[in-house]
Amino acid sequence: VAPGVILRSSPDEHARGAVLSSGQAPEQGLSVMSNGGYTMKLAALLPACALLVAGAAHAGHHASGKWKHDAISLPGLEGPARILRDVDGMPHIYAHSERDALFLQGWVTAQDRLFQIDVLRRTASGTLAELVGPGVIGNDVQLRMLGLRRAAERSLAAYSKPMREGLEAYAEGINAWVARNPLPAEYAALEITKFEPWTPLDSAVVGKALAFQLSFGLDIDVTLNFLTYQAVLGPAAAQAAFFGDVFRSAPFDPASSVPDATGAPWIPGVSSPGIPGPGRGRKHDRGGHRHDESAMRGPRVDGVTHGLLKRYRDKVRDNAFIERTLSRTERQIGSNQWAVSGSHTVNGRPLVANDPHLSLDLPPNFHPVHLVSRRDGLDAIGSAVAGAPWVVLGQNRHVTWGETTTGFDVTDTYQERIQALPDGSLFTTYQGQLEPVVVLPAQYRFNVIGDGQADNLAVAPGTPPLLIVPRRNHGPILDLEVDPATGQGTAISVQWAGNGPTRELETFRLLNRARNVRDFVAALQYFDVGSQNFIYGDIEGNIGYFTTGEVPLREDLQALTVNGVPPWFIRSGEGGNEWIRKDRTRRTDGTGYEYVPFGELPQTVNPANGWVVNANNDPAGVTLDNDPLNQVRVGPGGLPNGLYYLGYAFDYGTRAGRITQALDERLGAGRVDAEDMKAIQADVKLLDAEVLAPYIQQAFGNAVTAGVSAALAALAGSPGLAEAVGRLASWDFTTPTGAVTGYDASDVDGERLVPTQAEIDSSIAATIYSVWRAKVIGNGLDTTLDGSGLPRPGSGEAVKAIRHLLERDGIGVSTIDFFGWAPGSSAAERRDFVVLKSLRDALDALAGDAFAPAFAYSTDQDDYRWGKLHRITFDAVLGGPFSIPGATPGFDPSFPGLSGLAVDGGFGVVDASSHGARASRYDDFRFGSGPNRRYVGVPGTVPGSIDGESALPGGASGVLGDPFYANLLGRYLTNDTYPLRQNLGEVMRNLASQQAFRPAR
């Protein structure tokens, strides 16, 4: 490499190190290669997978009712210990020390989830091809470029000594299990016989990957979309149409966590935990502070940059790990949580509820575990992230907690001007000065599958180096183009808060032993990236809500202006849009940049209204007026201290709105209990239908009156329309399956009951409405956009936009008449035509080709059962028999010829089970994301008295054929729970197996 380019040895230069063969003990001083991974469907590799099912619960694995009295002698243990499995598969680890408890947590993780965690570390590290073959080399290149493993190395170095010791113990436990047991069946299918030893860095990578999935975002799509609007409409009209009509920041429902809980607005710099602010928040005076409309005219992106953005976006579209991250709002990757104070409950104790939403993979993302070391004050039970130690969601003897994702904006994407010199060195340009790009060489290997040779890795030819921009928090160049004649060019770089030495996992180490609000808040100071909303309850009767994360202060926003474009567009990398570097860092700082102080992040303790709700909605209400940049931070003396910017688009708000509505309904009727909380978690009422369906009744009522246009009258008289209108008029907006083979919350413990007539009627209405929703978006929004060559918004934005347009009779703030194509003498009549034509189109579609596999061309609306459309699948890494439906008994498809299990739910419901808002074919309503865990906790009055219940979409084990592979799934599907048994006596009364351990002599 030529002078001028900084060349450093890279963690991406993986040299294949020592491995642990099945049954081989690890040796000290092994050179360990650590990898990452990524979930892929590899059913084509598994023609004989069905033969693996019977023997998959291999020797050395637990089995229900199996007792093991002989203690296993393990090097590394400090004292005697035991693992008790209860009848639900939960491992309860009782150990001499916290270190031993974490060692055995590693042991049970390997026992239950070895292949899963191997895939996870390989995903994030960009070495998945070494496991699953050359088909994912492109994904490895992209993940290696983003540098999660490099970032994890920084975090590992910054962790405290107790944290690193815990990671080491956990890794030793994983490797100890591998040394004594055969590898799971997936490895045989991939011709792998050796496992690369787990390291503390691997757990740090898993933690970094989770933070990435919950916080990373590229600004490419919104930039490309707005550029098109500008080109077609011109700057002023584009701004009005884009921000005001189509891609709105304001939510569908205005539920906002802290203002709703406290009855007062959140004022950054004035409000404090548990103390409502004194008045309405100050809105930013744009004229007085130089933030005028010209600043919002869109990014200044040249043709080369436009091409780079499209090229990179196309590259990552097939990378499910990245695509899931970028589309997490569309895919309902979020969570629900709320807490109710004892003043509103039956027993006078607080209630805490939480259900995090992620992809519904098999095995589940979370691993149930109970960790006990009385000597070291550890007694925590709940869910761990497979691949990392400690409990991340759950309870200890004093406090209980849950989490949801905030949606804070902690990523900026930049257009860089670059210069390549004749000697081959490469530079970016900042304020007219050249700054060197760091080049990291990278080599990629892949598993050669099908050649009959085990553990055969080959080197991929022609692999590109990685280009790093130090100014961007060591973020990468995603793509670039250089003119060979001049050496001048353009690049796209990205800056993410998580690239720094952040310490999220440290938070969970501290939460596992927190005793009160003070301990809890102290632990949250380490949650630097992957910003979360934390819900809290304790045995002292407190409830609380806190947001976390280091939201960077941008230099222009801090100066009360916007330089060029807002942070959610591609910004100039040549100066004026930088994150402000910290001169001095505090012990808990992670990113190295100035950030919104913790005290200015939305939070409340024991709020005035006695409850608090978050479901990824706007926590502070800063976007309710559709402008995320018109509130200021209040500094010393009440003076403005920069723009208060958290993010530009939170969840569209239907879940938070419905939870708030349901709580209000129940509290209005009296006091509530844990059963009420579980019922709200199971709620499948469509809040958007409650708002939008009345337009159908109104339109039909108008259409049958005298004097309307012939076209509108004809629609009202078309076959089946009046029947459909009647069904929707009597509907309660719930979404049961309407099928005896479907799973509904009204069923019990996985046992499916015959639906009532009321459930059948609601099921039919849900089908008709859900297809109408797609058609009214198509007719009322997409027709106009498509006709002008303008990009469509995504599902959540589309539902927000169609509500906005229906409320305005189709006339946008841009003055565009979105319903102008429809016949009618007035805007209101054209609105009615769009609404009824969409219902006519929905009925025609249901009786046509698009839904024939479900409804066989039937025009009988009684046949339109929702369960035939709304189906869930649980996908395993290798697909085929490992998935559900698959080889697991008891979970066959609900209907012949239709994949998946019929379940209640739908778009934007509390019991997250969303599909695309434009779903227009029988298979479009199938989904694979939702609650990865449900939890309700009721803190008592003394230590150890928290009653917790949970649900898991599968089981503790990831080993196909194991009795705990899917034992909890039936209860999950019918919204039933299993108890978290924290007291030893309760565990012993519900014991399935036990294993003792002792230190090696």
What are these regions (language model features)?
Residues 745-842:
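Charged, long alpha-helical assembly modules
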Residues 373-383, 390, 394-399, 403-574:
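Glycine- and hydrophobic-rich flexible loops that cap the catalytic core of alpha/beta enzyme folds
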Residues 26-39:
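Short, Lys/Arg-enriched N-terminal segments with co-localized hydrophobic residues
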Residues 411, 478, 490, 529-666, ...:
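Hydrophobic alpha-helical segments
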Residues 101-105, 142, 151-164, 495, ...:
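Second-shell loop/turn segments in exported
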